[in-house]
């Protein structure tokens, strides 16, 4: 009985020690996070920091993109930030928004589920700053700043799908509405005809349309129409995006790699050599070529030796450039590696004096 008691005491001691260490470590992490945001606050321009309440914790800044004539929404930075969100995501918290600049103006009528919501973003809203304040049920407050910037959405985004790539999962088409959340629903059209989401040929998950059992006939124009409700006037707002889908037959992804075995150079002069991949695939960017130095490191845009990649019409080339050949390069062997999802090939070339 005494032995069991001693074992239990030792066990309890070690468990307590581990809990104490973990608690101490957690406190250190929290303190480091707070210090990080305090330092960020210190770097703010005076014209921004003057709007902050000195009694509130600072929770960072965010830059959000917006599209003219479309809805725009933004979360308060401490709720969106991965370091702080677990502290401040709580349905009982209150989030207030203000527009700041020359003056400050409350925006409580432009709030949806705690997020800033602008139903029709105009050029007058561009580059504006917004201050949000999260008030917890304990009365603590934390503030963040959001800046909005205009970005014009692409009119129609081309997308290519090759049969046999991942047919059992289907083709995923993403409706690229990234400027506003809280939409009601999304309807999809193919070639101006509404798609019936029957969960057989077509299914829908959030912003994605999934086309099952892909076929060449699935090529076409796909439009997604996103429906919103305005906070104030309850009018339906519709925003659209477009994809041009081209379904192609399964391709032959084999390719031929071409490279001279020697680089003839002259000391003190520049030199270059090109490694070429010739593909029969319709996917012109199917093959990627990389150069490796004698130590096996990839060569990028270094000062003395660098590589430039080009691709056109099924031919991919990577040219290795020597800015100024010195004796240390003589005898070095460089590897050209061509690869795609299916195949990989390598060839080598050696630097020799002419």
From Swiss-Prot:
Sugar attachment sites: 120, 124, 185, 272, 324
Domain Ig-like V-type: 249-348
Domain Ig-like C2-type residue range list: 68-150, 158-240
Keywords for the protein's UniProt record, in alphabetical order: Disulfide bond, Early protein, Glycoprotein, Host-virus interaction, Immunoglobulin domain, Inhibition of host innate immune response by virus, Inhibition of host interferon signaling pathway by virus, Interferon antiviral system evasion, Repeat, Secreted, Signal, Viral immunoevasion
Inducing or repressing factors: Expressed in the early phase of the viral replicative cycle.
Gene Ontology cellular component terms for the protein in this record: extracellular region
Cellular localisation: Secreted
Assembly: Interacts with host IFNA1.
Descriptive protein name: Soluble interferon alpha/beta receptor OPG204
Primary gene name: OPG204
């Amino acid at each position: 009985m005494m032995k069991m008691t001693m074992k239990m005491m030792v066990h309890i001691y070690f468990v307590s020690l581990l809990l104490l260490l973990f608690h101490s470590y957690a406190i250190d992490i929290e303190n480091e996070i707070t210090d990080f945001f305090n330092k960020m606050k210190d770097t703010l321009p005076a014209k921004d920091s003057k709007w902050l309440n000195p009694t509130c914790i600072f929770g960072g800044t965010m830059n959000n993109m917006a599209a003219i004539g479309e809805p725009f929404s933004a979360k308060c930075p401490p709720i969106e930030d991965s370091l702080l969100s677990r502290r401040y995501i709580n349905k009982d918290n209150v989030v207030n928004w203000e527009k700041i600049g020359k003056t400050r103006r409350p925006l409580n009528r432009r709030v949806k589920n705690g997020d800033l919501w602008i139903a029709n973003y105009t050029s007058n809203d561009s580059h504006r700053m917004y201050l949000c304040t999260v008030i917890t049920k304990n009365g603590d407050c934390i503030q963040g700043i959001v800046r909005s910037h205009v970005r014009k959405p692409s009119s129609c985004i081309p997308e290519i799908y090759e049969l046999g790539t991942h047919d059992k999962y289907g083709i995923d088409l993403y409706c690229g509405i990234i400027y506003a959340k809280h939409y009601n629903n999304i309807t999809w059209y193919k070639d101006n005809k509404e798609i019936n989401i029957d969960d057989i040929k077509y299914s829908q998950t959030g912003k994605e349309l999934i086309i099952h059992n892909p076929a060449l006939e699935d090529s076409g124009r796909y439009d997604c129409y996103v429906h919103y409700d305005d906070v104030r006037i309850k009018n339906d707002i519709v925003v659209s995006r477009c994809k041009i889908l081209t379904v192609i037959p399964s391709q032959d992804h084999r390719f031929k790699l071409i490279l001279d075995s020697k680089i003839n150079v002259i000391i003190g002069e520049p030199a270059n050599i090109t490694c070429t991949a010739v593909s029969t695939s319709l996917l012109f960017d199917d093959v990627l070529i990389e150069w490796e130095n004698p130590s096996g490191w990839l060569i990028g845009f270094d000062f003395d030796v660098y590589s430039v990649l080009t691709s056109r019409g099924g031919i991919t080339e990577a040219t290795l450039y020597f800015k100024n050949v010195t004796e240390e390069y003589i005898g070095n062997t460089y590897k050209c590696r061509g690869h795609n999802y299916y195949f990989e090939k390598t060839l080598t070339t050696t630097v020799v004096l002419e």
